[in-house]
Amino acid sequence: MIYTDQVLLMKIILPLLLFIISSLTISAQTVEIRVNQAGYQANDKKKAVVLSQEPFSGEFVVKNADTGKVVSERLQARQLAASPWGGSFGYYYEVDLSTIKTPGTYRLVDKSSDLRSIKFVIGPYPAYQEDLLAFMRQQRCGYNPYLDAVCHTHDGRSFYGPMPDETFIDASGGWHDAGDQLKYLITASNATARMMLAYELEKAKFGDFVDDLGRDDRPNGIPDILDEAKWGLDWIHKLHPKSGQLFHQVADDRDHRGFKLPQNDNADYGWGANSYRPVYFADGKPQGLSQFKSRSTGVANIAGRSAAAMAMAYRIWKTDLKDTAFALKCLAAAEDLYAMGKRQEGFQQGNSFGAPYRYNEDTWADDMEYAAAELYKATRKPEYLADAKRYARLAGTTSWMEFEDSSMGEQMSRHYEMYPFTNVGHFALYPLVDAKTKRELASYYRSGIERIVARAKTNPYGVGVPFLWCSNNLVVAFITQVHLYELMTGDKKYHDAMIAHRDWLLGNNPWGTSMFEGIPANGEYPEDTHLPTVQLLKKQVRGGLVDGPIAASTYNGLIGLTLTKPDEFALFQPRDVVYHDDVGDYSTNEPTMDGTADAILVMAMFSRAGISRLSGPRVSSPHVSKGSSSNPDNRFTYVEGGITRGDKTSKRMALVFTGDEFAEGGTAIADALAKRNIKASFFLTGRFYRTRANRQIIERLKKDGHYLGPHSDAHLLYADWTDRNKTLVTRQQFERDLNDNFAAMRPFGIDRKQVPFFLPPYEWYNREIVDWSSAMGYQIVNFTPGTRSNADYMADDDKNYISSDDILQRIKDYEAKDPKGLNGFILLTHIGAGPKRTDKFFNHIGELVEWLKSKGYEPISVDELLK
C-alpha cells in the first residue's frame, strides 16, 4: 500500500486547471444533510448532521420514504459549536433521530423547503461482511478467483536468510496488500487472526457460498470466512518452512510501475518482468537492498502475531471443522513461532527499496501477549499464561489512541507504527485471569477509549481519531476496541461513541460518502479507487475499505499525489483534513487488505443472523421503492414487474437503442436525432462502454443530452427462454454484472445515482431479476411489444429476418390499429446490427422521427417518459 509515483501527470498546469474548473462548477447548494447511508439499528443513538453556509432555523420531520407518512415531527436542529470541519459551511447542526425505532426506510425533511436527506434504513444491516470477504478474495495472490487467473508463481528468491541469497523459496499465495502487489506478513498475519476472531464472535453471520479457491456457487461445507482465513494460514506456513525460520515480505517498491493486473506484472527485480521477486527473511535486523533501511530490532511482532493466528486455527479446525491433522500442524507452528519471538524480542519492519515509505511497526509485546494467551487456551501450559500476563503489562496502554493530537492536523507517528491498531491480546487474555488482572486489562482499553471520546467532543460528527495515513483503519480499531471492552465488562458507557464512529465510515462525515467500495449500493461511495481491477478493467470491486481522510499537512508532504479531475468534495474539505475519490490520491482512496479484514467484524456486528449472502443496497433510487417489484404507478404497463409502456393517455413516447457488440449505426442515429432536436435513450453493455472504438460516439451521445443507461456488463441471459421463471444467474452474478456495467460507465462521467432505469440483456428477465434490480435501486424497463422493431439486428439469412421497410410499416400498422396508438410507447431498435445484416434500420431513423412528429407524437428520453 506504499506508493511513490503512480500518477505521472503535469505538476503545475493540471492542478491549476483543476482548481479553475472546480471553482466554476461547484454547486450552489447552501444546506446539506449527512446521515449514515447504510442505516441505523433500532436502539442506536441516531444522529444527522446539517451543514449550512448561513444560520439555519428550520424544523424537520421524518417521513416514511415509501408511503410519505410523517412518523416524527418537530425535530429541532441543535446548533453545534463552530469548528474547522465545515469547509465552506460555517454552521453545523445536529438532529436527533433516536426516537424512530420501527424498521423501515425514512427521510429527514425540512418542513419549510425542499431540503431532504438521502434515504436511510432502520433495522439490521444486510450481509455487508460478505462483500468485504469478496474483496479479500479479489486481493488473493496465486489463484485469484475474481480474475480467474494465476499470478506470481515464481515468488520468490531469498535475501538476508541463512541460505545463500537468491535461493528459491516457495512464497506463493497470500494477499496483495492494496492497489500494489507486495505481500507482507506484517499485515497478513493480522488479517488472518482478525477473520478468525470475527468468526468466533459472530458465527451465525457467515455463510458458505464459495470453495477454498474462492470460486462462486461451490459451497464446500466450510464458512467462507474460514476459507479465507485458511488462505492466510497456508501462506504463513509457507513463510515458516522449518523450525526457526520465518520470511516476512515478498517484493518491494520496485513493484510500483503503474497499474497492472497481477498475472501481467511488469516489475523486474533483476530476473525479468513477471518473474522472480525477492522474499525477505526475518532476521530481526535493519534491512533494505538499496539506500533506505528499516529499523528492525527483532521478530516478536510478526512471530507472535503469526503464532496467535496458528493457535486460534488449532482450536477452530479441531473443534468446529474436525480437521485434526491441520489443527495439529497449526499448533506445532504456533509453538515454534512463539519460541522465535521469545528468542528475538523486538520488531521486524517492512522493507523499502527506492522510496522512504515502509511499514514502521515498532510494537511487539501486544503480539506476544496475544500469542501466549491463545497458546495457553490450546495447551494449558502454565508458562504461556505467565508470559501472557507479563507481556500484557509490558504492552499496557500502548496505542495510537494515546497520541496527543487535539488539532487533528499533524502526522503524529510513522506509518503503521503502533500496529495492529487494536491489541486483541488484552481481550484474549481477559477470560483466563483473576478479577484484579481483569480490571487491569479493562483499564488499558478504557484509557485509549477515553482519549478518543475526549477528542471527539471537538468534532461535530463525534469522531476522535487522529487523521494519520489510513485513518479509516483507526476508526475501525476504535469501534472494535469498544466492542471488545463491552464484551469483557458489560459497560456500555462508550457505546454511543462507537456508533458515531461507525456512522462516520458509512456517510455521516463532511464529504457525505461511505468509505467502503459499493456500500451501500445506491449511496455515495468510493468509485475511482486506486486499484488495478477498477482502473484497468473498469469493474467495481465491492467491499474494500479505503484509507480515508488524512491530515492536510501529511497529504501535502507525500510524493506523487496529483488529482486527475476537479475535486467533487471541494466545498466540504475541512481546514486540516482532506479526502478525495480520485485515483490520483493513493493516500485517501486506496482500499487495503488488512483494513478491510479488520472491518469484517464491524459489519458482522450490525448485520442480521442467517441472512442471504449478498448485501444489496440500503439506499434506494428516488425513482424506485427498495425491494418492491409491485407496480407502483398505474399509469404504466408492466410485464413481470418491468415497465413496458408509459402513460397511454399522452402522445409522448421514447426511442430506445440498445448495444453490445456492434456500434456502426451510432453516428447515423446521432445525426438524425440532432437534426430534429430529439432526445433518445441508449442502453449499452459494459463491453460496449469499454470498447475503445466506441468512445467517440458515447461521448457525443452524452454531450447531445441523450439518456445513457446500463444493459448488463457481459450481455448475460438472465432467464430461461422456455421457462421464464427459471433464473440462470445467481444474485451475486447479477449484481456483479450490473455493477461492472456501471463501473464501465463511470469514465464517461455517468453517475449511477442519476441513472434510475435498467434495460436487461436480450430484453428478457423475470420477476426475480426485477426484485434484485429494484433492491439495488434500479427499475427495469423493456420495449413495448407488437411492432417487431427489436428484430432489426437479425442477419440476412436468419429465418426470422424482417426487412427495415417491413419494420417501419409494422410500426405504422400498429399505430393505426391500437386505439391508443403509440402513446407511452417504448420503441426499441439497435445501435448496430453487425456485418451479417446489410439492410440497416438505423438508416431509417430520420424517416421514422419525421413520421412520428407528423402524427403528433413527442419522442423523449425514457427517464422523461416515466417521470
Across the structure, where does each feature detected by a protein language model lie?
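N-terminal pre-catalytic segment of deacetylase/amide-hydrolase enzymes
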Residues: 619-656, 662-667, 675, 805-809, ...
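N-terminal carbohydrate-binding/catalytic regions of secreted carbohydrate-active enzymes
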Residues: 45-73, 78-88, 327, 346, ...
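Metal-dependent polysaccharide deacetylase catalytic core of the NodB/CE4 family, i.e.
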Residues: 652, 674-802, 820-833
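Bacterial Sec-dependent N-terminal signal peptides
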Residues: 1-30
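Structural recognition of the beta-strand scaffold that forms the well-ordered cores
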Residues: 185-187, 192-199, 236-238, 247-248, ...
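Acidic-and-aromatic substrate-binding clefts and catalytic sites of carbohydrate-active enzymes
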Residues: 359-363, 378-379, 398, 659-664, ...
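Edge beta-strands of extracellular beta-sandwich domains
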Residues: 115-122
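Aromatic (Trp/Tyr) and acidic
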Residues: 38-114, 134-193, 197-198, 219-222, ...
